[in-house]
């Protein structure tokens, strides 16, 4: 990632996201800490923090091949689980002390089956995520979280009390608030941060101890006040999509003259735009309500598309967005349908929309540049 940002905290974020194993995880492990890998932002990582574990969001950063994992998946599975599983088969996830999967989609669901069959991780569980966002589904997920809570206590010999859960929720909410403050700076006419520079900040929060991340985030917010952004961008853009942890994708977009000022992705605002409710009596009930209903959902949740498009429009207005780019991993059926509906709604709202299909590991830069250039020209044409 090319950047002019001079900040020790920002450098730490970049180091934590440049690969899978990073200095922060190494230090945690050397001190005797345990690491819990997990797929999907609907897994309640507060539970791991309360158990004294380091939550680590699974990714395939640095992967160059799916040679080993191709035998584990069909030819219509997307490249995210392929690359992530390949890294595991190469031994790059041997530092994990456990893994929690979830039935967020059939592609990720297959990781659970293959992980159990081929890897020796002693604690591997799968959570059952409901399909809707109503009261019965909150009750269902409440039971799922309590089930996982009991399994963690038994396997790791820890006690996850309500008090420890509330402490974890408070810490995670404080981090969410700090992340929102980072995004606030992107509302200016000359944002001091590009989209490509913001992404490592967000991914780092899922790749290092939470207290350490909070401290670095506070330091960075002190540094960002000294940064000066450049103006004259062709358009203010928003990214909507799912599994996007690679800054290079945004770099290519921004090299064409646009600047990404906000997003609705599972490594972006959907993680932190709204907090867990700390006013209820039961911390598990608070988590169940948050992960099923309170936080902005993704296409995995049925019947919630009207709220999702309202959320996108709300952010687009707040950040003065000129156009929206929908990114989708090839073979992701959920986002394929979602982007079709999003495109229809945004056309009615007269907001330019471009859908870009991609592989998990960056490729096809020439085609990406051409399509983004044409999109920016369309936006500029609408102004004249």
Report each predicted region and the residues it spans:
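A charged, amphipathic alpha-helical module
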Residues: 1-34, 142, 146, 150-274, ...
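Peripheral docking tails and interdomain loops at the edges
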Residues: 3-4, 340-384
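Acidic/His-rich segments in extracytoplasmic proteins that coordinate ligands and/or metal ions
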Residues: 83-154
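A short, acidic, amphipathic alpha-helical segment used as a generic capping/interface helix at domain edges
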Residues: 88, 303-320, 337-338
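Hydrophobic, well-ordered secondary-structure elements that form the walls
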Residues: 324
